[in-house]
Amino acid sequence: VLAYDPQRRGQQREGGPMTVQSKAPAAGGGEPPEGRVGRRAGISAKTLRTDRWWIQPVVTFAVLFSFIIYSTWAAFIDRDYFSEPYISPFYSPCLAIKCGTVPGSKGVPHLGIFGHWWFTSPAIIILIVPLGFRMTCYYYRKAYYRSFWLSPPACAVAEPHAKYTGETRFPLIIQNIHRYFFYLGILLNLILTYDAVIAFRNHHGAWGHAGLGTLVLVLNAVFLWSYTASCHSCRSIIGGRLNHFSKHPVRYWMWGQVSRLNRYHMQIAWISLLWVAFSDVYVRLVASGTITDVRFF
């Protein structure tokens, strides 16, 4: 804080504007060369942070990497993903005729769009949508940029890359298709909601029944809808392209609700990611006969 000095103010008024030059020390110490005033000090340390800033990127890397390994295995194993009336979210909707011909999938409903010529797991077709939606998500981009690419690993921590081009070049410029995956994500959510509804049947197809698997699939649909609704693209679509909110009270109200949900987008992103994996695990254990579904009524 600078104290007010009336005499100094008078000197400034008589002699014209007062010029203050701050001479920062050069990178090697000592006074900077003449003509290079105001240069920042050279700091060789990677960061001046003293907290455990590395914990978050390490945990993020571990969780995302584990999910990638498991989801890849679950997609290619091509079995044990259906037990009436439960179907794994990794395999829904089943688009290939071969869906009902592998162990642990007898009787699974399929659309048959891909005929007998489809030789690999039908999950490969479906997982493109949730994978593309989450990979281009604004929060997940931040998460894996920091944890996998260290760009940067944390706030106020230097990154190892020599230059930064952002998302203006291939392949990162593809991130701009996030909004289109948003619409596909809504379609997939509708299908998974249908799976949750038909889970209120027993293995004979009679309605009015529920088990632990029903609760698992219902919560999976709720978490996925919450993740989609809290998405930044959803908030932009609802409240964007409006010059006056007062002329659109309904959209303004919807935008306000989505904005409140958007505050928890990070937490919802993790909950929905882990729960969809848990949903697959539960259905897989029931379909393989490892456990028996707990029936409520």
Locations of the language-model features?
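Short, Lys/Arg-enriched N-terminal segments with co-localized hydrophobic residues
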Residues: 1-17
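Membrane-embedded alpha-helical bundles that constitute the cytochrome b-like, heme-associated redox core
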Residues: 4-5, 19-297
